[in-house]
């Protein structure tokens, strides 16, 4: 059954908060427990003149091995489906991060979701998927 928008919004925010409290478990699932990291969220305003779309990134894991996991946190009542719109949003976030920060690090799109992801052409672009169960393993 579909939940009211306000409830779904609350669940999404609560899920993001749980994820932020379980960074060590996320790093373990990604196989980077032993890598020195800095974890933050990130935001930039739109600036069309400079090719910046405007982005809010739920979690960035900047790794000492010159990789950034760009983590999208998505609450869903079932497997999450990456649509063309979501794929474009992730690509825009990667572009914004590169342009604004000037990073030369590799950027790995990473999905953190409740029940995994529906396999499709867009999900193939993800480097990693972390599920709710992984946070409590």
What are these regions (language model features)?
Residues 1-137:
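A cross-kingdom feature that marks ATP-driven nucleic-acid transaction machinery
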């Amino acid at each position: 059954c579909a939940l009211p928008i306000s409830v779904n919004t609350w669940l999404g925010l609560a899920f993001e908060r749980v994820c932020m409290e379980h960074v060590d478990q996320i790093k373990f699932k990604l196989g980077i427990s032993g890598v020195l990291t800095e974890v933050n969220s990130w935001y930039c305003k739109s600036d069309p003149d400079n090719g910046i779309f405007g982005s809010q990134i739920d979690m960035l894991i900047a790794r000492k091995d010159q990789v950034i996991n760009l983590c999208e946190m998505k609450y869903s009542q079932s497997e999450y489906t990456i649509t063309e719109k979501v794929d474009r949003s992730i690509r825009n976030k990667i572009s914004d991060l590169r342009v604004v920060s000037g990073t030369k690090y590799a950027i790995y799109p990473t999905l953190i979701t409740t029940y995994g992801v529906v396999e499709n052409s867009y999900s193939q672009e993800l480097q990693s998927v972390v599920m709710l169960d992984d946070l409590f393993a």
